[in-house]
Amino acid sequence: MKITYCDALIIGGGLAGLRASIACKQKGLNTIVLSLVPVRRSHSAAAQGGMQASLANAKKSEGDNEDLHFLDTVKGSDWGCDQQVARMFVTTAPKAIRELASWGVPWTRIKKGDRPAVVNGEHVIITERDDRHGYILSRDFGGTKKWRTCFTADATGHTMLYAVANEALHHKVDIQDRKDMLAFIHHDNKCYGAVVRDLITGEISAYVSKGTLLATGGYGRVYKHTTNAVICDGAGAASALETGVAKLGNMEAVQFHPTALVPSGILMTEGCRGDGGVLRDKFGRRFMPAYEPEKKELASRDVVSRRILEHIQKGYGAKSPYGDHVWLDIAILGRNHVEKNLRDVRDIAMTFAGIDPADSEEQTKDNMQGAPTNEPEYGQAMAKQKGWIPIKPMQHYSMGGVRTNPKGETHLKGLFCAGEAACWDLHGFNRLGGNSVSEPVVAGMIIGDYFASHCLEAQIEINTQKVEAFIKESQDYMHFLLHNEGKEDVYEIRERMKEVMDEKVGVFREGKKLEEALKELQELYARSKNICVKNKVLHNNPELEDAYRTKKMLKLALCITQGALLRTESRGAHTRIDYPKRDDEKWLNRTLASWPSAEQDMPTIEYEELDVMKMEISPDFRGYGKKGNFIPHPKKEERDAEILKTILELEKLGKDRIEVQHALMPFELQEKYKARNMRLEDEEVRARGEHLYSFNVHDLLDQHNANLKGEHHE
């Protein structure tokens, strides 16, 4: 039996895994990265719109800082995130942007002078300062107070992945693709690597290491309609679950992106709306301002997805053979802007829908017939233009994943996790656009360093016989799938699982349907034990791969559905129509799912409390819908009083905003990442002879004083 030894084993070749591999090589570790696909084809490349970091370079970004990015992230999560992790993230993100620039990412840059833009559906002129010429530009994204999303046109993930992959190769990281991790090797609650199948030869071998980091991405493919690539099936997270020790966090927290192309499901980046694109119904009316007057199309993703579906349910969706949808109008931005800044979107729309989204030519007035005249809140009907893109919400992102602490350590010692595969818990119950492509790079930096330190100190304490036993177990399972007498077809089971998840565990959830979904998923899981693969070869066998992955996917589907059924509240992307309020009194916690015994047919669910008294920002009104639509935590007022007292006392002592922040909620972070981020406006403050950072303490005070002005719950 073949066994390969290394210091650091990283499973997953996207942004998180590759950035962590660089951290390991920088400490002199023998590092191996295993990937299902050539690493430059990892799903990180599909990210289009941009990466959030508070640089405050451009006109619409002025005044931005870590505090505002932190506030947006916490509110966006519907107070479900780990606030210490959010602080680590927002502090490191500006450094990550500049590191990526030094590695060759061609960030779109500021050009001095006037530039046209579309804001709130209106054409405006933005004037950039001469002294900011050449600095990194940011665009607007949903749920943010400032234009913070740095970008490379609409191919941000692609350029980032290529730059990080090149840097990993420069450091001579051993990258091996076409490798599929089947199971983790573990003993005495410690992880020592993984059993791996070569997708080309079918050979099953072991990779034994001092430390293992999982970075295999999300689990979107358990749904039928998703923007995720075929490799995003959650098998890595499921393998962690199957150890019986590692736990999954917040699996019911599944994000549905508002603008997926109909019918293909390919993502139409949030940058379309961030740059000024608008959503229209079948009558050509812009409808989002009627639902969300402040943020409109740039409300958080969970909010926009719900509003689109609500509008369709009212009968305002455009008809198509693939179901009702609404229109995304970016022709309003002008052909020059679309062809320059949204060229991938244009190419996708033309290739997969036969639509040129820059085309503003009037196509027909048929859609205006029968348009209501007594609903002025939705605006005036207008003739459909050729360039409007058909879109509707589809599964997009996994907020849940393998539960880790802020250092990336899982419940299984020696196993770390980073990126979308992890529940680090940066995103809580809703992720902000632009934080996804940020997270794997930032997590790869932070967790990669902690992981490398672990590998430097750890020892391999497992004998060859135990490793070979893990290999044999996987070999026996492959033999069983190929030669058992079962009659079940893997594709029939997999397809029905996806349909159940779409129909009953989607954007809107309800107890009875969740119970039905749970029952059917249990039946499918039982049937999956009798799958027999028709193609009998071990090598180059996609049917065999689908067979062993489908059982893992069903375990994840059960975790998602059981978590959704038990959580009797609505929080972020988890919307229970039978429990419409967010309930901080009962549900300010994190769901933990485990599978301690292979004999179980359901996950074990427990909860991890979020401590209000340690939060920098206590749970409050999120800014969408009715202000009273949540049940406050009983300790909220006590924590608010503590926060306010601390801010006022430290302000009197002349402390700056960063010193105030550390007093409110200390957090651990490597010194090189915790160092203060410098911005161009800091130099202007120095030039005026003012105390650096002190001018922002009042912003922090306003943020925590809002409850005294009646801006939280009623």
From Swiss-Prot:
Cofactor: record remark: Binds 1 FAD covalently per subunit.
Residues with the Tele-8alpha-FAD histidine modification: H43
Family annotation (Pfam families): FAD_binding_2, Succ_DH_flav_C
Enzyme Commission numbers on file: 1.3.5.1
Keywords, ordered alphabetically: Cell inner membrane, Cell membrane, Electron transport, FAD, Flavoprotein, Membrane, Oxidoreductase, Transport
Locations listed in the record: Cell inner membrane
Catalytic reactions on record: a quinone + succinate = fumarate + a quinol
Cellular component terms per the entry's GO annotation: plasma membrane
Binding of FAD, residues: G13, G14, L15, A16, S42, H43, S44, G49, G50, E420, S436, V437
GO MF annotations in UniProt: electron transfer activity; flavin adenine dinucleotide binding; succinate dehydrogenase (quinone) activity
Signal peptide: none
Family in the record: Belongs to the FAD-dependent oxidoreductase 2 family. FRD/SDH subfamily.
Complex formation: Part of an enzyme complex containing three subunits: a flavoprotein (frdA), an iron-sulfur protein (frdB), and diheme cytochrome b (frdC).
Identification of the protein by name: Fumarate reductase flavoprotein subunit
Native organism: Helicobacter pylori (strain J99 / ATCC 700824) (Campylobacter pylori J99)
